[in-house]
Amino acid sequence: RVYQKTSNGWKRIKDTTATSYTDSAVSVNQTKTYTMRCIDKNGNTVSGYNSKGWSKKYTPVTPTISKLENTSSGIKLTWNKIAGVYGYRLYYKTSSGGWKRFKDTTATSFTDSGVSPNRMETYTIRCIDKNGNTVSGFNSKGWSKKYTPVAPTISKLENTSGGIKLSWNKIAGVYGYRLYYKTSSGGWKRFKDTIATSFTDSGVSPNRTETYTIRCIDKNGKTVSGFYSKGWSKKYAPVAPKITKLTNTSKGVSATWNKVAGVYGYRLYRKYAGGSWTKVKDTTSTSFTDSGAKKGKKVTYTVRCIDKNGKTISGYNATGWSITRK
């Protein structure tokens, strides 16, 4: 049975069958005094104890960085928890060989985003109290890791009016990204360098499946990461066009709609109250003036995409867009 000395005498803190015990309820620079006695299986004391006890001032040991790993956000540092301390102070080694403080935290991990591809980073750590004073030593050699950007992940592929929109995660320390699509022969073909984290591929065809991958590049256009060799795939299905403007003109109702990537043309429909949709015009343009609209009547239009054979290849807005013909 282990006891610690309090202002009111000895306080029991632990019964154990082992021959060692670690007291984690400690404070920095606190001196604690312990004693102990034997017990039987029923918890009865069966020995005396040292009434003076044994004392120890608690000084936090130096933390150990147990893991350094490359992530999409930078180098992630993980270290062991130290009992009784408020937090930790991280340092990195400068080019001149000194240590520079860069983060105070109460956690036991942190990701350094201030990294550069292929640059070696060296870190060390020490404990701090709630006032920011250091309360432990530190490993003067530190722990080192070369930052190698991880391959980006395409997180979303979606059909839009502009084509297939690709979105991917940001990778720390890189200049930009290089996009590739898979060719019919199975190889990868580069088609776009960008510093953004999304891009819309307009070079698509209806019902064709496109496969993409991506890697990081530096400012000179050199690749600095690997890539996902299987890629991410999406079948391009044209979205329904949207009529953006309806105007009365001397020749009829002028309808204008947005362009949809990869399609041959568009089919315009009209209907009147209580009626059904009637085809007005097939066109490769994104506007048309309907001279057949009845004057004084509320007329509603919608539009869908067609291929070169006149087959519809998109849905349409069933509510449509309306105007009263003057």
Regions found by a protein language model. Name each.
Residues 23-42, 112-132, 201-221, 290-311:
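Beta-strand-rich modules
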Residues 1-6, 13-16, 22, 34-38, ...:
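Intrinsically disordered, low-complexity linker/propeptide segments enriched in Ser/Thr/Gly/Pro
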Residues 26, 71, 82, 115, ...:
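Hydrophobic loop/turn residues within beta-sheet-rich immunoglobulin-like superfamily modules
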Residues 1, 10-12, 30, 37-38, ...:
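Arginine-selective low-complexity/disordered segments
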Residues 2-28, 89-118, 178-207, 267-294:
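Recognizes extended acidic, P/S/T-rich segments that occur
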Residues 59-68, 148-157, 237-246:
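Proline-enriched interdomain boundary motifs that mark the N-terminal boundary
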Residues 41-60, 130-149, 219-238, 308-326:
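Extracellular fibronectin type III
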Residues 74-84, 162-173, 251-262:
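Conserved aromatic anchor
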